[in-house]
């Protein structure tokens, strides 16, 4: 095929060479030479050089066709002229069309490819809408709480920005690095950051300039320039708003936390319905025992439900046996000293994880971790020491602990303090007797299983616990004997038959259901349970006691002991639990009958329910303080305050000023003394009066009888709450300062505006002076004795001293009649004159007695004169208002009492506002806090809520709870069967 094409090409070439085609040129016409054509073919006979074959096909070339691949230079081969055809426009058009098609095709293909790539990237991006809940709610609320316009106005200009941020480049670099970390895939964060224009202060220099350009920061006329101080103030204001917002959120959370804590503390009292969890059989039984333990301690009784009581001499290995059964070193250990100071109830149950927890705590201790084991031992030791009262060594309070783990036998064991024979130094004198009484209290339960622990490494004759056990269970129907430290016994005891006698029950004077021999370690407290088990198994495998058949295989190892104790425990439970349930059912019936007969119309409210009822009543009574009318508050405050300060006003201000000779001196003296009184004593006295008034009103609402509905069972509680609330309440410290200014301004005012105020001041002055005159008359009557009417009517005579004072009074009255403008004090010559006159009549008088009598006589005379002056001043308001100078009618004392009266009214009004607006609410808050504290203190509730009714309701609640839980346990026990 290639040869055919080449031959055809040669024919075409020859035809072209011999044709008359030519090119029109400006030069003379030349003939094209055949050799000058640059057309070569590989198959031409005259070809000398091998060139790349020209791939052509049979087609006629023209000026409109596509140009050949290689340019050929055509020369004229014949002489003469040929027509020149210029096709440069066609060539240019074809090239332009080629570029257009290329661009158009590239654009279409590139657009399609870009769209496909964008769709692929969009599909690869995760959908972040599902994760919006991760972002806090306040992030979405930023736009509501941040005023962007105000922040934009507060932002500095470009020039000021450089001054405010000298380290602009470093901040920009840090922000760029942060943006590089969070930019891929985190559009949500960028939106939150972009919500605040404060980014202008944090962006890079390039970004800042770019944003300033976009937002028009190049123009200084767009924003008003403000000073640096105003900018700082605006930013601080925004910061304070944000702080206040989060402070309110924090306070709300604290309040909710406190309410939730209170609900948790009262979950049993208010009957909060919680999701019922299916409990295991042993957990249900342990819960019953916990309730019974509290019931027994409260009423000095002992239930008869089965439990395994672990008793033994001190350091006999009780705790070690219990730890081997629980498969964890959970108890604090000591070398020979007493470590078990109170009974510890351990509830063993099977579970997937080896954990321990206390009855009153939700924390779980992982017994596979050494740090949790150490924390558990420390917690048990702390609880033991806290349960021991001052001056004692052991405690009767039971510590309840639950242990769950794989392979544990279900049972309830109680580890008791070890029995001692001698009280050592540091122990309480009654320690031995207390331990015996605790052990007897647990062992005298006819359904209790006694696990008697005996140290095999000591002589049997030194045992104390065996005698005690034989006394409590002489037939041995519920006793299991355990011999510990058999490895030491085998080494130390010369006769192995002695161990055999112990295990067979022939050596000790006691009987038992079964006898076991165990090894609980080598005496090293750091040994693990696994190593102790391995040592125990290895010892008994190699022991001569087993090889010589002195011990049987089922009598050794703690595993066999645990199985035997568990079987005995559940056998005892099944035999006795229904009988105990019937006993509590009978007790419940008796208590309910007693309640119906004694309190037929009252609900059975226990102590906690009564406390809640009393709490609501107390809070209602506190709310009643806000219902007191303002008029009542002001009347009480004004009356009480005047009773407190009237003596000071009369004795220290009015009387000394009234002794002056003219009105100017009177007013000056009054102003000075009022100023001193206001600066030092008056505000403090006013606050004291207000606080006492609040106490009196609070006490009145707390103690007033409510008629038939009043329940005196709450009286002690209400009194305690009232006293504690008043003790905690303190008046606002700034009240005195504000009162001082108000009182000073009130006393400075002297202008009485109308006749009504004038008459009110006169009435106020008359009442005050009449009261003082009455008191003075009473004092004088006591000094001089009864007058002639009382002496004749009531047959009362005067004493010798009263006769002397009566004569002295008569002489002094004569002196006043002679000089009605006499000064307040007697001169020495006047005292001598009075004494001489009395001596002339045979009456010897002491000068001090004369002066004392003169004080009361002159006081009565002055008060009567002042009252007469009040009557004269009733018509003096016109002179006062017109500022007439009339020496016969100067009513400065009326103005003084008007100032005092006005000060009292303004002070009472101010104190009333403080009471109703602030102090009553603060007192209510204190009452709530006191009630919450009392609610958490059970001892306080027991002390304040007492009586037969309360005790009977408590008994009913406990017995019902015990019976219900026992019935639920019995039902679960039958289902397990």
Swiss-Prot record:
EC id: 3.6.5.5
Transmembrane portions of the chain: 96-112
Site (Cleavage at site S1): 211-212
Chain positions covered by the region annotation Stalk region: 606-853, 891-945
Positions contributing to Mg(2+) binding: 319, 340, 415
Stretches the record annotates as Paddle region: 753-873
Positions of the UniProt region annotated as G3 motif: 415-418
Record-listed GTP binding positions: 315, 317-320, 334, 485, 487, 520
Region G1 motif, annotated ranges: 312-319
Ranges of the Mitochondrial matrix topological domain: 87-95
Function according to Swiss-Prot or TrEMBL: Dynamin-related GTPase that is essential for normal mitochondrial morphology by mediating fusion of the mitochondrial inner membranes, regulating cristae morphology and maintaining respiratory chain function. Exists in two forms: the transmembrane, long form (Dynamin-like GTPase OPA1, long form; L-OPA1), which is tethered to the inner mitochondrial membrane, and the short soluble form (Dynamin-like GTPase OPA1, short form; S-OPA1), which results from proteolytic cleavage and localizes in the intermembrane space.
Name of the featured protein: Dynamin-like GTPase OPA1, mitochondrial
Native organism: Gallus gallus
Gene that this polypeptide is encoded by: OPA1
């Amino acid at each position: 095929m290639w040869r055919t094409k080449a031959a055809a090409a040669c024919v075409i070439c020859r035809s072209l060479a011999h044709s008359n085609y030519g090119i029109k040129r400006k030069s003379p016409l030349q003939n094209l030479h055949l050799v000058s054509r640059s057309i070569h073919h590989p198959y031409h006979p005259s070809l000398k050089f091998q060139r790349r074959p020209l791939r052509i096909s049979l087609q006629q070339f023209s000026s409109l066709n596509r140009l050949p691949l290689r340019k050929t230079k055509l020369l004229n081969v014949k002489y003469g002229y040929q027509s020149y055809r210029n096709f440069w426009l066609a060539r240019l058009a074809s090239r332009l069309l080629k570029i257009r098609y290329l661009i158009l095709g590239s654009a279409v293909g590139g657009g399609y490819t870009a769209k496909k790539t964008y769709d692929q990237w969009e599909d690869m991006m995760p959908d972040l809408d599902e994760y919006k809940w991760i972002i806090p709610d306040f992030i979405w609320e930023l736009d509501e709480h941040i005023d962007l316009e105000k922040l934009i106005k507060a932002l500095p200009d470009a020039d000021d920005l450089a001054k405010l941020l000298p380290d602009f480049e470093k901040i920009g670099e840090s922000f760029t690095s942060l943006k590089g970390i969070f930019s891929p895939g985190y559009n949500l964060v960028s939106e939150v950051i972009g919500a605040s224009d404060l980014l202008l202060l944090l962006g890079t220099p390039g970004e800042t300039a770019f944003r300033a350009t976009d937002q028009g920061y190049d123009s200084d006329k767009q924003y008003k320039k403000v000073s640096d101080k105003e900018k700082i103030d605006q930013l601080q204001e925004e910061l304070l708003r944000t702080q206040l917002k989060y402070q309110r959120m924090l306070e709300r959370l604290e309040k909710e936390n406190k309410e939730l804590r209170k609900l948790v503390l009262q979950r049993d009292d208010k009957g909060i319905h919680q999701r019922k969890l299916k409990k295991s059989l042993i957990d249900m039984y342990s819960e019953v025992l916990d309730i019974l333990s509290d019931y027994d301690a409260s009423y000095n009784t002992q239930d008869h439900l089965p439990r395994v009581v672990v008793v033994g001499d001190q350091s006999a290995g009780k705790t070690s046996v219990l730890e081997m059964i629980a498969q964890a070193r959970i108890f604090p250990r000591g070398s020979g000293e007493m470590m078990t100071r109170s009974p510890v109830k351990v509830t063993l149950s099977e579970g997937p994880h080896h954990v321990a927890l206390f009855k009153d705590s939700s924390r779980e201790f992982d017994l596979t971790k050494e740090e949790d084991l150490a924390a558990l031992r420390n917690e048990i030791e702390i609880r033991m020491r806290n349960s021991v009262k001052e001056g004692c060594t052991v405690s009767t309070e039971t510590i309840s602990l639950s242990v769950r783990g794989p392979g544990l036998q279900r049972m309830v064991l109680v580890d008791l303090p070890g029995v001692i024979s001698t009280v050592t130094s540091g122990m309480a004198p009654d320690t031995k007797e207390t331990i015996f009484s605790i052990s007897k209290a647990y062992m005298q339960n006819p359904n209790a299983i006694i696990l008697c622990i005996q140290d095999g490494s000591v002589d049997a004759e030194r045992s104390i616990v065996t005698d005690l056990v034989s006394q409590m269970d002489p037939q041995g129907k519920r006793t299991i004997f355990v011999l510990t430290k058999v490895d030491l016994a085998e080494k130390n005891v010369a006769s192995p038959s002695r161990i055999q006698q112990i295990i067979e029950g022939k050596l000790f004077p006691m009987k038992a259901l079964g006898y076991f021999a165990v090894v609980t370690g080598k005496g090293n407290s750091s040994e693990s349970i696994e190593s102790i088990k391995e040592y125990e198994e290895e010892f008994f495998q190699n022991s001569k006691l087993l090889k010589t058949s002195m011990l049987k295989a089922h009598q050794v190892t703690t595993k066999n002991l645990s199985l035997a104790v568990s079987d005995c425990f559940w056998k005892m439970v099944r035999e006795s639990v229904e009988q105990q349930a019937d006993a509590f059912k009978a007790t419940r019936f008796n208590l309910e009958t007693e309640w119906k007969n004694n309190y037929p119309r009252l609900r059975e409210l226990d102590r906690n329910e009564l406390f809640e009822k009393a709490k609501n009543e107390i809070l209602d009574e506190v709310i009643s303080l806000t219902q007191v009318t303002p008029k009542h508050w002001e009347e009480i405050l004004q009356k009480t305050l005047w009773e407190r300060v009237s003596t000071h006003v009369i004795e220290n201000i009015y009387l000394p000023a009234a002794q002056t000779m003219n009105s100017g001196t009177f007013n000056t003296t009054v102003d000075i003394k009022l100023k001193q009184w206001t600066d030092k004593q008056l505000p403090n006295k006013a606050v004291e009066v207000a606080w006492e008034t609040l106490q009196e009103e609070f006490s009145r609402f707390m103690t007033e009888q409510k008629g038939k509905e009043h329940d005196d069972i709450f009286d002690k509680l209400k009194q305690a709450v009232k006293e504690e609330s008043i003790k905690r309440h303190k008046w606002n410290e700034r009240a005195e300062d504000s009162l001082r200014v108000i009182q000073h301004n009130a006393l400075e005012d002297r202008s009485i505006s109308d006749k009504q105020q004038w008459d009110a001041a006169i009435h106020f002055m008359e009442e005050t002076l009449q009261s003082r005159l009455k008191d003075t008359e009473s004092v004088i009557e006591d000094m001089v004795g009864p007058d002639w009417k009382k002496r004749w009517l009531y047959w009362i005579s005067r004493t010798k001293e009263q006769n002397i004072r009566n004569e002295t009074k008569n002489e002094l009255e004569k002196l006043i009649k002679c000089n009605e403008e006499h000064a307040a004090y007697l001169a020495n010559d006047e005292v001598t004159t009075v004494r001489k006159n009395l001596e002339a009549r045979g009456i010897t008088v002491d000068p001090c007695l004369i002066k004392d009598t003169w004080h009361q006589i002159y006081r009565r005379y002055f008060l009567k004169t002042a009252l007469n002056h009040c009557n004269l001043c009733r018509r003096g308001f016109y002179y006062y208002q017109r500022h007439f100078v009339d020496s016969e009618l100067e009513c400065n004392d009326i103005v003084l009492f008007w100032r005092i009266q006005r000060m009292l009214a303004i002070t009472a009004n101010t104190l009333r506002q403080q009471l109703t607006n602030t102090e009553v609410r603060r007192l209510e808050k204190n009452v709530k806090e006191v009630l919450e504290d009392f609610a958490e203190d059970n001892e306080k509730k027991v002390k304040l809520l007492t009586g037969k009714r309360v005790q009977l309701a408590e008994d009913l609640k406990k017995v019902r709870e015990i019976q219900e839980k026992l019935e639920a346990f019995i039902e679960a026990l039958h289902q397990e069967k």
